[in-house]
Amino acid sequence: MPRSTRRMLLILALLAVALPAGAWSHKEHIQLTRLAAGRLMADPNTPADMKAWLKSVSPQVLTMDEERQYLMSARVGPFPRGVEGLPYWAVVPDLVAMTDGPGDSGRKIQPFDVPERMLHFVDCEYFNKDIERRRYRHDLSNKPKLYAFPTGLNDPHPDDKNYKPWAKAGMLPFRVEQCYAQLVENLRKKRLTDKPGQFPRDEHAARWAGYLAHYVQDNCQPHHSTEDYKSRAYFAEKRTAPNVHWDMEGRLVDDDNNDYPELRSEFWTVFAKALDEVKDPIDTIDLRTATVEVALVSYDALPTIGLAAMKAYEQGGTPDKPEGGVKGFDAGKFFHAKGKYLGRERTVLEIKAHQMAWSVKRVEKLWLRAWEEAKAPVVEP
């Protein structure tokens, strides 16, 4: 077998293993990023020069009717098809993570010195001082307080000077901060997009805006805030438990078959409404702290998602003591299950729509903030 063929088979095998453990699917990252760009271009308050830049780096903006059709029928798959500009850069972090391989074998991203996959989440339970509390519980009793998250990457836990939690917990807050800073720097240097004669070719604002969109969107996926990122706690057989992470995101919208058309249509209606109604409640300027705050809010959706998964797979027992085997996934039971989140009862479908709409609003906010910061005079310390 030729070496190139063996290499491609290896990559495909790694993708098959890694894809279900990702964040929002490629299709969702593409759509959320494109929506953020389109909404800013349509907003009369967006600076004209920013609109011109967005148009040049996101040329595939669609109408809402076209976006609905995209959600209903577009097939993207593990290798994104027909995508360019900001939406393309918004899926690159997942492509890097998937081709890195398992564990710590991937190329280390600096200055974090960890593989790409460690930059997509922050497992909140690791910020508990007591080791026995560093796991997810249905009653949210192991959800830490904001003060427990150290400021610096190598800073110890405020209540245990011998414990540095970031090394295990994931470094999403620091990656968001880094991408934002790189976006501002490239905007200031007028490195707006890839062009001949500009080197390095892939060092430009469009790349970092796409990366920033990706990580901000990941931040709004509840499973990216917990060590139990597949909701295995809700199943008796932990090792073979269903991947609820994937059920929550890509399963509904991007597959080889025309699955769940009624649910997709219902979701789009709820999501389109959420885009008009959802407000970003996070006003914190410091991006690391703001990212942690988003994770802590999203964390509260996990019990509803876990209980919905038990219903969808007919898992017996209780959340604290699941019993017996499971059956096939029932998407209707899963997405229509209800629980309390953000002060009112919501279905899982509504939670998914809310989180995705929230991510669009946060991407818009940070892109606009970066543009305005890049235009402002640099103040010397």
Language model: regions and residue ranges:
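N-terminal, motif-rich segments that launch catalysis or mediate targeting to/interaction with membranes
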Residues: 22-207, 222-381
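Bacterial N-terminal signal peptides that target proteins for export
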Residues: 1-9
